[in-house]
Curated annotation (Swiss-Prot):
Gene: qrs1
Positions that bind ATP: 270-272, 276-282, 466, 495-496, 503-505
Biological process, per Gene Ontology: cytoplasmic translation; glutaminyl-tRNA aminoacylation
Subcellular location(s) per record: Cytoplasm
Motif 'KMSKS' region, chain ranges: 502-506
Source organism of this protein record: Schizosaccharomyces pombe (strain 972 / ATCC 24843) (Fission yeast)
Family stated for the protein in its record: Belongs to the class-I aminoacyl-tRNA synthetase family.
NCBIfam families: glnS (TIGR00440)
UniProt name for this protein: Probable glutamine--tRNA ligase
Locus of motif 'HIGH' region: 269-279
Claim: Magnesium is one of the keywords in the record: no
Length: 811
């Protein structure tokens, strides 16, 4: 036992742990065993390692003990190797690695590196810029709350997509300096505010209810303010046209002459799939920024991968941009510039800034440091003569090489800590025909080569993209400057994620192929075609993007917030109809068979411009089954035997007398009276639909589709493909077959689209069924589905429920 003790003590000491930690660890048998296992997996027990690596291995061993499921430690050796190789340098990265690997059967190393910040090296200048961007975006709040926002700002930056991997002391010092530059030294008022805040915290328990109400009121107040994302935050701080400096000043003169000094942006999707809710932000940012500044925006298809592109994706993207209310200045394609890009590739070779390489993927990875993140070195082809690379590149063009036998690489800077400078691939061989150029080309440019150069060709003033491309800004500028062309300004904002939804093309494709959803436009998905079919108006999506705002931080938004934004948009902008999901017949026995009372009902009492329609109260009407109970109770204010209820807009209440039931004892008809003698106002009013042949009432609904969350879990994005089916919510789609609605629905069909908005809130086509939107009173917001076969086969989709849903069954 003593020998084992001494061996472990020697091992723990060799990895740099201090004496106290070694002693404490040896007292804990489980921790000792776990740490020894980690050391053995990395072979540092005999050779030792520096203290930083040792402490990280200790963190891993300690975390492994806390995992309840043994499977969670399946990739412990892989994480340990990443620590020893220097890929994982901080506790934050190690913890991120543990979280990433927790439920993974296999590890995608490139995805692992992205999720754990491997290779993310921020220079002091980049930290200065990112912190400065954050302070600029929040300037108004900081000026108002001053140093009270310092600590919350530091917390926010610790969650930043890139800054969280940076040295936190350096980030904090930079933030402190930025606050000092903006606010000056702390004043007595700042100190008093801090004390006041502390005093409030001590009394918080006594004020829980009041503070909760105040917080709720504040949220409501803040949501009611109209936010313009182009006047505040990230987009308001962008440079003016001409404000991005050039390596060659003459290029800026040429650019401004071509653009007239205006804003020029672009939305550059890859036509390899359907757009999702996250893309709506990119559309709104790029097209909206140009529109706000009276500039222009290109719709440019980045069609450089013919193996994944299909015509249906091109058409869908065009259609959705128009649906969101934007008109491209021009629709262009990266393939439009293939000839020009090829010429510049040859020029890059002639400038000794590119070379043809024949290395395999594995050889390239190893030369970039490999899994061990060792030293980087040039491959044997890097210094080949210019003439030789030029000849080989032309051989690639002429089809003399098969895929992966030859590539063109940019000759960048392998010593740079940024992976985007490690001789990126510019051209590769592909044998697939292109949708637009056919078999003309055997080689195709990569995104890294194409994107910045086409931005340059189109004189883009603001190349706006998400923060995943921050590191790419260096290679973007390097290539433009290497060729001495105009260099647009790339600027990055945080992407939009709607939590609880699935965005992965691969995973959605699995659901589609296996029949779990009804295609890419299934209303339970968050693709834009699905949201459109569900009935979400384009203007509501734009309002949502604007409300969330544009900053450099990733926006992780709950589905509930998105749906609330849709509700607010629809509340006063669509007509209202009486709709009964589950109708039951009511016979008013004191009325004649010929009784027909005309009642004029506005489509929306808050907006007379929507007009009105006539409803006819007759002897036979229908109410919703949920609005009737045989026995009264103190919390139920609708119709019971003994409790009258008002009919919406009708002159008098109804009084239930008795119930007719079927053989199973279920109510199938209510016998009631229309009580003209009553002068007492009912406690509540319910919707109703008459049986009236003259007005073709009621209108039968073939299907009413109610949509709920597709998955049972809160984070389906974290599921593996094989786990998706088990987590599907069996109640995600509920179909009702016997619903009815009043004939006013036909008035809405004739006068669609609803709501009536200008093009800044999107463009609905009247002939599209989803443009017929309305509020089903006390039920929710609905639209017609594309399965509708007018006029006698109507299918409804619920867009969102009403806020009152949770309380409906109580009163």
């Amino acid at each position: 036992m003593d020998q084992d003790y001494e061996e472990l003590r020697a091992k723990f000491t060799k990895i740099g742990l201090n004496e106290t930690t070694v002693k404490d660890t040896l007292k804990n048998k489980k921790l000792s065993s776990s740490l020894n296992k980690v050391i053995e997996e990395t072979n540092v027990g005999s050779s030792g390692c520096d203290r930083t690596i040792g402490n990280l291995l200790f963190t891993l061993a300690n975390a492994s003990l806390k995992q309840k499921d043994p499977k969670s430690n399946a990739h412990e050796a892989f994480i340990a190797s990443k620590i020893v190789s220097g890929d994982l340098k901080t506790n934050l990265q190690v913890n991120a690695a543990i979280t990433y690997c927790k439920d993974k059967d296999t590890i995608d190393e490139s995805e692992f590196d992205k999720e754990t910040g491997v290779g993310v090296v921020l220079t002091p200048e980049q930290i200065e810029q990112l912190v400065g961007d954050y302070v600029a975006e929040n300037k108004s709040k900081i000026l108002e709350q001053r140093y009270q926002l310092l600590n919350p700002s530091a917390s926010a930056l610790r969650q930043h997509a890139l800054l969280k991997w940076a040295p936190q002391l350096e980030v904090k010092q930079t933030l402190d300096r930025k606050f000092l530059e903006l606010l000056g030294p702390k004043t007595e008022q700042d100190a008093a505010a801090g004390k006041k805040k502390g005093a409030k915290a001590k009394n918080s328990k006594q004020k829980t209810v009041d503070s909760g109400k105040a917080k709720e009121q504040k949220i409501v107040s803040e949501q009611s303010k109209k936010y313009n994302m182009f006047e505040e935050g990230f987009l308001a701080k962008l440079h003016k046209p001409g404000g991005n400096t050039q390596l060659i000043p003459e290029r800026m003169k040429e650019h401004l002459q071509a653009t007239g000094g205006g804003v020029v942006t672009r939305f550059p999707p890859e036509p390899n799939g359907y757009l999702h809710i996250g893309h709506s932000k990119a559309i709104a940012v790029n097209f909206g920024f140009a529109r706000y500044h009276n500039g222009v925006c290109y719709l440019r298809f980045d069609d450089t991968n013919p193996e994944a592109e299909e015509e249906r994706y091109f058409e869908s993207i065009k259609d959705l941009v128009a649906w969101l209310g934007f008109q491209p200045y021009k629709i262009t394609y990266s393939s439009d510039y293939f000839d020009k890009l090829y010429e510049l590739a040859e020029e890059l070779i002639k400038r000794d800034k590119a070379y043809v390489c024949h290395c395999t993927d594995a050889e390239i990875k190893k030369a970039r440091g490999g899994e061990e993140r060792g030293p980087r070195y040039a491959c044997v082809h890097r210094d080949r003569p210019i003439e030789e690379s030029l000849l080989e590149f032309r051989n690639m063009r002429d089809g003399k090489y098969q895929p992966k036998e030859a590539i063109l690489r940019m000759k960048q800077d392998l010593s740079d800590g940024n992976p985007q400078m490690w001789d990126l691939i510019a051209y590769r061989v592909l044998n697939s025909p292109h949708p637009r150029t056919g078999d003309k080309w055997k080689i195709y440019p990569t995104y890294d080569f194409t994107h910045c150069l086409v931005d340059s060709f189109e004189n883009i003033s603001h190349s706006l993209c998400t923060t995943e491309f921050i590191l790419s800004r260096v290679s973007y500028e390097w290539l433009c400057n290497a060729l001495e062309v105009y260099c647009p300004a790339q600027r990055e904002y945080g992407r939009l994620n709607v939590v609880g939804t699935l965005m992965s093309k691969r995973k959605i494709m699995k659901l589609v192929k296996e029949g779990y959803v009804h295609g890419w436009n299934d209303p339970r998905l968050y693709t834009l075609v699905a949201l459109r079919r569900r009935g979400v108006p384009p203007g509501a999506i734009l309002e949502f993007v604007s409300e969330v705002g544009v900053t450099t931080a990733v926006s992780n938004i709950e589905v509930a917030r998105f749906e609330n934004c849709v509700r607010k948009f629809l509340e006063n902008s669509v007509p209202r109809l009486m709709f009964l999901p589950d109708p039951i017949k009511v016979t008013l026995e004191n009325l004649d068979d010929s009784y027909r009372e005309q009642i004029e009902i506005p489509f929306n009492p808050k907006d007379p411009s929507m007009g009105s329609r006539s409803a006819f109260l007759t002897k036979h009407i229908y109410i919703d089954r949920s609005d009737f109970r045989e026995e009264a109770s103190s919390d139920f204010f609708r119709l019971t035997l003994g409790q009258p209820v008002g009919l919406f807009r009708a002159s008098h209440p109804v009084v239930a007398k008795r119930v007719v039931k079927n053989d199973e004892g279920e109510p199938i008809e209510i016998i009631a009276e229309y009580d003209a003698s009553s002068s007492k106002k009912p406690k509540t009013f319910i919707q109703w639909v008459s049986r009236d042949k003259e007005s073709n009432s009621p209108v039968l609904i073939a299907e009413t589709r109610l949509f709920n969350n597709l998955f049972k879990c809160d984070n389906p994005a974290a599921l593996k493909e094989q786990e998706l089916a088990a987590q599907l919510n069996p109640e995600s789609e509920v179909v009702l077959k016997n619903s009815i609605i009043e004939p006013g629905i036909y008035d809405l069909i004739k006068s669609a689209p609803w709501p009536k908005t200008d093009s800044s809130a999107g463009v609905d086509k009247a002939e599209n069924p989803e443009s017929v939107r309305f509020q089903a009173m006390r039920v929710g917001y609905f639209c017609l589905d594309e399965d509708t076969k007018k006029p006698n086969h109507l299918v409804l989709n619920r867009i969102v429920s009403l806020r009152e849903d949770s309380a409906k069954n109580k009163n």
